[in-house]
């Protein structure tokens, strides 16, 4: 485990999957308010050398963000003299087994306002490069450059009518790896952006993968820039791997 102080009131604790396993924890344990989760946080706090201003500081709130190979826990202190508040993790009732609905509820509660904003590097670099091409190149040169960029990367926006369809999509693509993925909600519709790296693949790879995606998803009627501006982002990176790795009941 590693700890980094972000500000006077916020710590970031990075917990590897090996750390979780050693403590008998799973990713889904963070999605419900239960005694096991509370005990784990007390244990982590005992094991780490907390800054002095976090010791006996009153109420602490926790926000959990799953990553591809770890869990990031953001610890925020307040001046209220109360016990640890674990309600920030979720407001769901106890359940037996993780259902898609419960997982989605936890995502909406915990992730859409998270403060650890890390750019979705590959997609952002792709968009930035295309923008620079637009602004600096003549039309013939621009066409050649854009074609070269698209040969290396392509991205798709997929739509899902409900969260069950998202789960089916992730389960149906268990063995598929992508360069990047984001997960959004807009109204009652869910969206996922998928970035594919094409440089080492045959010419037909992109079309084959898109056809495979559409076996489980729908063609989106929104672009990624539109979703970035208007939709709620539930996972801003590694959305597909996280959903693939989750065990559904």
Swiss-Prot record:
It holds the Pfam family MecA. GO terms for molecular function: protein-macromolecule adaptor activity. Gene3D superfamilies: 3.30.70.1950. Homodimer. The N-terminal domain probably binds unfolded/aggregated proteins; the C-terminal domain interacts with ClpC. NCBIfam families: PRK02315.1-4 (NF002643). Belongs to the MecA family. Enables the recognition and targeting of unfolded and aggregated proteins to the ClpC protease or to other proteins involved in proteolysis. This is Adapter protein MecA.
